Amino acid sequence: MLKTYTTKSRIFQRQYERRKRRRERRKRLICTILAIATIFLLVYAGCIGGKKLGEKISEIRYPVAYSSYITEYANDNNLDPYLVIALIKQESNFVADARSEYAGGLMQLTEVTAEEYAKKLGLTDYNYMDPETNIKIGCYVLASMIKKYDNIDTALAAYNAGVGNVDNWLKNPDYSSDGKTLYYIPFSETRHYVKKVNQYIEIYKTQAVIQSDNRKDE
């Protein structure tokens, strides 16, 4: 009787241990699945959060303000709005009251240039530092230079370094082979300027940007 009981006890013990091992395997499997699911969710959330953070950083680095003024006066002068946006980014980074040694405003106009082109536009009582006025005059100046040189890069060089310098460079075979386009710009600042404006054009065509209300930014 004792032997029979002992045999049954061992059988029950083995069955219990097998059930225990199965429960432990199921538990480990469930824990593994939960861990994988948690990792997946964290990675997914990180990707989404990272994307949104990247977009926010992009918006900060590449903002657009006064967009309706830019669109209006770019269209009035047959200019690519992205060109105007890129130029303003390089000139003032959309700071309306930005000033350098000689120029001011969003498109960094000198008082002399603003006065010359304001007359051509029929403006009498004006403030060239006003955002709308600055963009209006600046777009007209840029369009005039593109018309004069029939080349955007040459026009950008003239916008930065002045028409007199560019005209002299075009006459120099070291800088121009045809007298119309510049294959080398002797001023390093102007070379960098033209390069950066072109880079910004491509960036703004692909980046999500802030479209700010004009009056809000004034």
Regions found by a protein language model. Name each.
Residues 19-20, 27-36, 90, 107:
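Extended, non-globular alpha-helical segments
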Residues 12, 40-43, 71:
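Residues marking helix boundaries in flexible regions
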Residues 9, 34-37, 144, 207:
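Residue-level marker of intrinsically disordered, low-complexity segments enriched
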Residues 1-27:
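N-terminal Lys/Arg-rich, disordered targeting/topogenic segments
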Residues 31-48:
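Hydrophobic membrane-insertion alpha-helices, especially the h-region
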Residues 48-218:
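Catalytic glycan-binding domains that act on GlcNAc-containing polysaccharides
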